Design a protein with these regions (language model features):
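Short, conserved structural patches
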Residues: 54-176
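Alpha-helical assembly-interface signal, strongest on the long, hydrophobic N-terminal helix that forms
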Residues: 2-73
Length: 176
């Protein structure tokens, strides 16, 4: 009778081990994926900081070039594009300064618009993080809308070097 019972239990240990290993592996992969998500959050924070910093010292017409600069691109998370990073110039009230048609304005009008800029904001727009297939039940098909990230800094030179009497190269616009 004892032999009969023992023969029915052969292989049970390997089945239990397989189930436990499977559960542990799913847990480890889930923890790694959540860690990758949190790392992407930090990368986006750093990306907006770098982009805002560059925008404070680059000329206003370079605002569409900043998201493609190497300093910013190196911090892109997976599936991020330059269109997801928006650079905006703000007046003293925090309202966006409209720069459309800036190059077609007269020098006086350009100076007037330029003088309104007090802050620079870099923000993430419409970026969705994609989880790997293991966590694809999170969000919509594994896509999760990222929280709003933005960095606002006071405007500095905005790419314009002030003229000095002892330097012939000063008073020019520096292209980033």
């Amino acid at each position: 009778m004892i032999r009969k019972k023992m023969s029915k239990q052969k292989g049970v240990t390997i089945v239990e081990f397989t189930l436990i290993v499977l559960a542990v592996m799913v847990l480890i992969i889930g923890v790694l994926e959540i860690g990758r998500y949190v790392y992407s959050l930090q990368m986006m924070n750093e990306m907006t900081r770098k982009a805002a910093r560059l925008a404070t010292v680059c000329y206003v017409l370079d605002q569409h070039d900043i998201p493609t600069m190497d300093e910013v691109v190196e911090t892109y998370p997976a599936d991020f594009t330059a269109e997801n990073l928006v650079i905006e110039y703000l007046d003293s009230s925090g309202n966006t300064v409209d720069l459309t048609g800036y190059t077609s304005l007269s020098l006086e009008e350009q100076s007037s618009v330029f003088a309104m800029i007090r802050f620079v904001r870099a923000r993430i727009d419409n970026y969705q993080y994609r989880f790997f297939s293991l966590l694809s039940f999170i969000g919509t098909d594994g896509l999760l809308e990222m929280p709003e990230f933005q960095t606002t800094l006071p405007a500095e030179s905005l790419g314009v070097v002030r003229p000095r009497e002892d330097d012939d190269d000063s008073g020019v616009i520096i292209d980033c």
